[in-house]
Each structure stands twice: as structure tokens, then as C-alpha cells.
């Protein structure tokens, strides 16, 4: 029987309209594919890939592909279902204080580490402190923008304190927990992880391969797949080549590469919606965008259906807010702006923008001076999809009377321009 390989397609939800003013940090959120792919036999083996790790400590790790593998070895403090609601993991139950600034949590007393010791509150406190001292670009470091501390209140209970009373504080608690006794007393823990998840490390070959096996100490159900082999790769191109040559069984990819793997006799595609999103943002420091009618005109000029098809090959979910459409927080009943150039033109006209000299470009007298309707669109040139969006937006805005400059820059310059406010619109 031919082994059927799968690739997991990240569906981004795309093209909300937002504003860029004061910078706010956001916890990076991740989702994982949970769709069942047939039923594996007990002796089945799966081959995955990840980058060559600097460390296998999940709280110090800086690489997302490594994090995906480490999720098999370490349980998070809290898990989250497909709709974004918190579910038990290391924490069994929890309750917020009246002011929302602290969270009391009871831990699952049945969880044991793979060295045989029991998980306790000391491990949670140690994990938070480890994360506090982690590199700034560690995968879970942004958790500390929300969490201010963690204290032990019992053998299996802790209190998490937050910097502010914020509705999404609980979302920050998806970071993994590590055993204090092991990681505080060993010198070679970077390549010998001890976790509490469904798998444990069986062997490790530096810069080559890691083997995982189903963990005998895992408190939950025994995994259907008993062995996982993890190939270490240099980059995304290597991942793709390994999958195409049958060296790995799973490839996580995005909409841009989906068409390559449409032959379901060789591979099966299983889609999941990530929390990544592309958007068009206004720089509200600019006087132009203080006029709601002009902002509405831009919204009506965005051909979202066309972009969904041409840029994302229809592998995207559109949203009108920066919230995953599958989330329990997503609100359906909000104002929407379907593509309507005629409506866009009407809003500009009602705001006083006219084409007096019939050159196709709109002007307006402001403080006694005739000014043209101009906008600069900022986009980072490394992201081909966003460049396509920016180019199409330029075309559409030009058609309704804007003079548009497309500012395609490298990522470092892009970041600097965002910080300094040197843009009118941004595709991000």
C-alpha cells in the first residue's frame, strides 16, 4: 500500500483595514492542525522536519519549526481549541480575580515528567522566570509583555499576575512548562529535553536527525503513531525538496505553494486557519485619514475577492476585524465594505475632492491652497504576496483619483518607516 503523505496548508485570514498609531505589542499566537488523517497502525512511523536547533529548551528556542516539534514533548500551561477558547493542559482549572489582574490556577496532579518526577507549582514558577530571562527573539518571549509574575500558592497551585487588566491576558498562557529540577541542575539540557508530552526523545544526532517515541509516562491517551523521525533542514526550500522526494511525510506551507501538491494520490491537503493576517493600515498621524469619508473611499476601493483569488489562490478567509473568523470572539455584525469603486468616488466627492482640470487626479482646497489627493503605500519587498496587494491597491486608488507612490523597501527600512511614520498606507 502506498504511503500517503500530507501537507498542512496555513490559511491566512486577510485584508482587514486597520490604523497605525501608537505601537502596541501583541502576543504571537499559533494554531495547529487537528484534523484526523486516517487511522495509523500502532507501529506506524512519521517523518517530519525542523531547522537545526540551537537549543531544545522550548522556552529559550527561537525557531518556529523547532517549536512545532517541541510541542510534542512539552505540554503548555493552557491549551486552546479551534475557536480560541482556553482548555485544560498543565493547568486543570483557573479563576480570574475581580480586577482581572491575577489568575489562580490549579494544576493537573496526574502529570509526570519523563524522568519520573511529578509536575508541581515549582515548575510553573521556574518556567515563568526562565521566560523572563530568555532571548528577546525567543518564540514565547512576548508572553512577558503581559505576565508580570508567578507565585506558588500550594504544591499544585499558582497565581499568575498580569501587568494590566486586559481581555486577552489568558491568551498569553499558551507557553510550555519545563521541569525545574532537571533544567536548573543539568549542564547538557539543550540537547536532552525532558518533557511531559505524548512523546519523548529517543535519540539525537547533531545537525542530522532526532527520533521521538511515544512516552510511557504521558498521562493522556497513548499516541496512535509510536515513532516520529525528525530530519534537520537548512531552510524552507530544503523542507519542500525533502517532501517532494518522499523523505518527509508532512509539509507545512502557505497558499502560494498549494497548487504544487494538489495530486491527492500522492499527498493529502489538510487546511487550518492560522492567526496570521495581512491588512491594509492607515497612518492616523496623517491629516488625510482624519476624514472618515476618505478612509471609507479607500475601503470601497479594495478588491478583496479579487485579491483572495489572485494572491491567495482562494486559500484565505476574509475578515473585517483583526480576529480569526473561527474565534469565539469574532463578531459577524460589523460594518463591511464590499468592493465598489462608484461608492468610493462618491465618498471622495462628498468630502470635497474634485477633478477640476479633468486630468483624472482629484484636488481639494485646504487652507486656501489647492492640494492633490496623494498617498504613499509602504510594503516590504521580500513578501511577494504583499507586494502584489500593494500594486493592485495602487491601481485601484489611481483609478478613483489618487496620486499613488508605491514604496517597496527591504524589511529593515520597512520597520524604520513604520516607527517614524513615513508612510500613508501600509500593507502588513
Predicted feature descriptions by range:
Residues 50, 151, 202-211, 229-286, ...:
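Extracellular/periplasmic solute-recognition and catalytic clefts
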Residues 81-82, 173-227, 232-237, 341-346:
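Gly/Pro-rich hinge or "lid" segments in bacterial periplasmic/extracellular proteins
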Residues 47-48, 398-428:
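Periplasmic binding protein-like
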Residues 290-395:
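Append "and occasionally in soluble cytosolic enzymes with long acidic Gly/Pro-rich linkers
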Residues 92-136, 288:
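Aromatic- and charge-enriched surface segment that lines or borders ligand/interaction sites
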Residues 49-96, 129, 194-195:
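N-terminal lobe/hinge region of extracytoplasmic solute-binding protein
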Residues 17-19:
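C-terminal motif of bacterial Sec signal peptides marking the signal peptidase cleavage site
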Residues 95, 140-183, 203-205:
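Surface-exposed binding/hinge segments that line
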